[in-house]
């Protein structure tokens, strides 16, 4: 069993989940006038929902919550708010996944306070119900146990974050490549390493160039 369970998400799954989410919104009888993506994870799902729902107006708000892969900041905050007049508009806020729910809750409060919308509802592709303190109005998938979902749009960022998590927790900055890859298997599982192998190597090269990790090709003991 990996130390950190990771589910690698395909783009086909994203399209299917966004379609499922759009169906739930339509079935509720509610139609948004504007979609607001929570940057950065909400960009792709929000754009897909615009397509499924026939919405032409797409904005974004950035809420900072996760500093790196499988790490959590002490407190989420709005980094770049929306600052436009949305009077009379029905607004749908979209994120990729709701973990604690802090990001979605903050985005909703920010838009309600600064933009004067008629109504604000929230949506996410997935909700981890075991840890969520704020539930969105709509979601496609319920996740009952915590898993790190590795989406297509932050593959390099995840890979770099996972590498640096190993470095921080082991206190070791110099690695044999084979040894580091075996550690990845133990920590993150076969699926992640097999499907994201190229991204892991890319992130290793990037971190090596920045002087954060030193990797050499040698056989691990």
Where are these regions (language model features)?
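PRPP-associated nucleotide enzymes
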Residues: 1-221
């Amino acid at each position: 069993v990996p130390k950190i369970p990771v589910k690698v998400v395909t783009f086909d799954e994203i399209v299917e989940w966004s379609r499922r989410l759009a169906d739930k919104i339509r079935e509720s009888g509610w139609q948004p006038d504007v979609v607001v993506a929570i940057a950065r994870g909400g960009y792709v799902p929000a754009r897909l929902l615009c397509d499924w729902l026939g919405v032409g107006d797409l904005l974004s708000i950035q809420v900072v919550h996760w500093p790196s892969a499988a790490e959590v900041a002490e407190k989420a905050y709005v980094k770049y708010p929306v600052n436009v007049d949305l009077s009379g508009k029905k607004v749908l806020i979209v994120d990729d996944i709701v973990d604690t729910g802090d990001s979605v809750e903050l985005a909703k409060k920010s838009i309600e306070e600064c933009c004067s919308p008629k109504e604000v509802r929230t949506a996410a592709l997935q909700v981890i119900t075991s840890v969520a303190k704020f539930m969105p109005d709509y979601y496609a998938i319920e996740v009952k146990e915590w898993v790190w979902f590795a989406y297509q749009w932050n593959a390099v960022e995840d890979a770099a974050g996972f590498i640096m998590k190993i470095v921080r927790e082991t206190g070791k900055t110099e690695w044999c490549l084979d040894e580091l890859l075996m550690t990845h298997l133990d920590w993150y599982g076969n699926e992640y390493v097999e499907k994201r192998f190229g991204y892991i190597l890319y992130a290793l090269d990037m971190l090596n160039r920045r002087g954060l990790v030193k990797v050499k090709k040698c056989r691990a003991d």
